[in-house]
């Protein structure tokens, strides 16, 4: 399902674009693209890339259709890459919606029994990358709050599932795609619950 996700045109993220998109450019190309299209560019390694806003998702426009398809027994693929951001009366906006926040909003809007975010990491870890690293098997959103600010891919996942659990009171999991059964059974991954 091509999934449109409503965002606020007044979201502060539009004032400070930060999500990299597209190819890399040289400094000469940067000047031409900024002048021609008004793009924002930032350094990504030794090159430059375009950046766009990443506003908070507010409403999944197709949530009722998605819920109906699920109730009819269909496997629904939706919100790909965070969905298509729209504002106002449905006008597209140049932005990227965080896919984990989009998944959490979808789970909330369709009253899902829970939310599972699958990734290549098998859990949320304390002391990641050190000899003391330890998988966190179960935690509350408040206990995971320090991990929401972590650099890399795990921070947005923790933010998304923690918000979902707080708003809905239902459990969420973060775990590896290759261990989905073990994650849901509590033998792998991290369960986030109240």
Which ranges hold each PLM region?
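C-terminal catalytic "cap/lid" subdomain
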Residues: 1-194
């Amino acid at each position: 399902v091509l999934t449109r996700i409503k965002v606020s045109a007044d979201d502060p993220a539009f004032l400070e674009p930060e999500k990299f998109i597209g190819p890399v450019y040289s400094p000469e190309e940067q000047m031409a693209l900024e002048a021609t299209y008004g793009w924002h560019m930032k350094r990504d390694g030794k090159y430059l890339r375009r950046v766009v806003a990443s506003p908070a998702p507010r409403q999944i426009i197709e949530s009722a259709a998605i819920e109906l398809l699920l109730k009819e027994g269909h496997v629904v693929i939706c919100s790909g890459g965070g969905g298509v951001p729209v504002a106002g009366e449905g006008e597209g906006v140049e932005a990227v919606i965080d896919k984990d926040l989009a998944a959490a909003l979808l789970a909330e809007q369709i009253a899902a029994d829970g939310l599972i975010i699958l990734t290549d990491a098998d859990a949320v870890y304390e002391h990641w990358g050190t000899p003391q690293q330890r998988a966190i098997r179960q935690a509350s959103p408040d206990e995971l709050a320090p991990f929401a600010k972590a650099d890399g891919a795990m921070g947005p996942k923790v933010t998304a599932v923690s918000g979902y659990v707080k708003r809905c009171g239902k459990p969420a999991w973060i775990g590896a795609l290759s261990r989905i059964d073990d994650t849901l059974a509590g033998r792998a991954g991290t369960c986030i619950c109240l």
